[in-house]
Amino acid sequence: MPVLTDPLQLLQALIRCPSVTPYEAGALSTLEQILTKMGFNVKRPVFTDKNTEDVENLYAKMGGEGRHLMFAGHTDVVPPGALEDWTYPPFEGVIDQGKLYGRGAVDMKGGIACFVAALARILEKRSIKGMVSLLITGDEEGPALNGTVKLLKWAEQKGEKWTAALVGEPTSVKTVGDVIKIGRRGSLSGVVTVKGRQGHVAFPERAANPLPLAGKLIQALTQTALDRGTENFQPSNLELTTIDTDNPAVNVIPAQTTIRFNIRYNDVWTKETLMTEIEKRLASVQLKNNDYQYPYYQLEWIPSLGSVFITKNDKLIKTLSNAIESVTGNIPEYSTSGGTSDARFIKDYCPVVEFGLPGQTMHMVDECVTLDAIETLTSVYERFIVDFFA
């Protein structure tokens, strides 16, 4: 059993569990053992969905009446890749020259270890005048179907309500406390399949080449910016991710080609208005069908969870900002940049902010965190918890 007030020992214990999504691999069991010793009531619901693996989750709660602070995170990690590329084994938690190495050190077992250690330090001195809960999933790096979104609904059905939430994702950039996330852009993905008619290149009149139409559709999607950004968000961006024709032959006109794209969108749009805009752009392309009624296109939207949001709870943001400044001297930047996170689900239940370790090495070979950063984040979390319940 690691020392509860030592985030390094806690982090090493978690890293030594190879919990690549969707496998628990002992990570939640280790956390359950630690939290139970601290006085938490721990539950381990398992969720499933069609065509997905069952996923274990953890919900732990302590305290009585009053304000309720949720800490949210995940113990699942991305695959380490080629083991021979790592300086140290990715699931051993080796410390060398002031850094702790391991998959999940930054994203985001480090944040969990720091929060637990911070709370343990407080409990050595005083009790919490309120409630603290940890909402931890094993399905954040994967489809995110059997994790936080279902865990929140499960907890709500049991009567849980939260005053605010802190997500321990690695939001800092260069140093602990330089950036906190107060919102996130939405994500929308689609697939455009352009149907043609296969044929010999020497007889184009007998075929229908989908590629020229695909080029026009791509131009319609990308030639005009979606927007110029807003006060809190950078401009929305549409990125083509694949163009697949699957035709290695140089003398064959292909039967079809597929265009996949993703849009990260700001608060100019809702998911519905953005879908309408994309459909309008595609429809602006004139189809020139031959006698076979080809080519033509089909648009399919890929189901997505969560949408763009901004947290406007000034008290929550200020409490966190003041804690950061008092410990580090940094006045954090309020940001909405980057990818999505499980905060997109939590915002439907309570105000949420995100703050954690510097994320330069997340998902990389030799993912690591400095020992100084771990101690600093623990101190900030400790100050934030105390101030939250003051």
UniProtKB/Swiss-Prot annotation:
Active-site residues from the entry: 76, 140 (proton acceptor)
Pathway the protein contributes to: Amino-acid biosynthesis; L-lysine biosynthesis via DAP pathway; LL-2,6-diaminopimelate from (S)-tetrahydrodipicolinate (succinylase route): step 3/3
Keyword check for Hydrolase: yes
Residues that coordinate or bind Zn(2+) 1: 74, 107, 169
Cofactor: Zn(2+); Co(2+)
InterPro entries: ArgE/DapE_CS, Bact_exopeptidase_dim_dom, DapE_proteobac, Peptidase_M20, Peptidase_M20_dimer, Peptidase_M20A
UniProt entry tagged with the keyword Transport: no
Assigned keywords, A-Z: Amino-acid biosynthesis, Cobalt, Diaminopimelate biosynthesis, Hydrolase, Lysine biosynthesis, Metal-binding, Zinc
Any one GO MF annotation of this record: succinyl-diaminopimelate desuccinylase activity
EC number: 3.5.1.18
Highest taxon, organism lineage: Bacteria
Catalytic activity: N-succinyl-(2S,6S)-2,6-diaminopimelate + H2O = (2S,6S)-2,6-diaminopimelate + succinate
GO biological-process terms attached to the record: diaminopimelate biosynthetic process; L-arginine biosynthetic process; lysine biosynthetic process via diaminopimelate
SS bond list: none
Family: Belongs to the peptidase M20A family. DapE subfamily.
Record note on quaternary structure: Homodimer.
Function: Catalyzes the hydrolysis of N-succinyl-L,L-diaminopimelic acid (SDAP), forming succinate and LL-2,6-diaminopimelate (DAP), an intermediate involved in the bacterial biosynthesis of lysine and meso-diaminopimelic acid, an essential component of bacterial cell walls.
PANTHER family: ACETYLORNITHINE DEACETYLASE, N-ACETYL-L-CITRULLINE DEACETYLASE
This protein's name: Succinyl-diaminopimelate desuccinylase
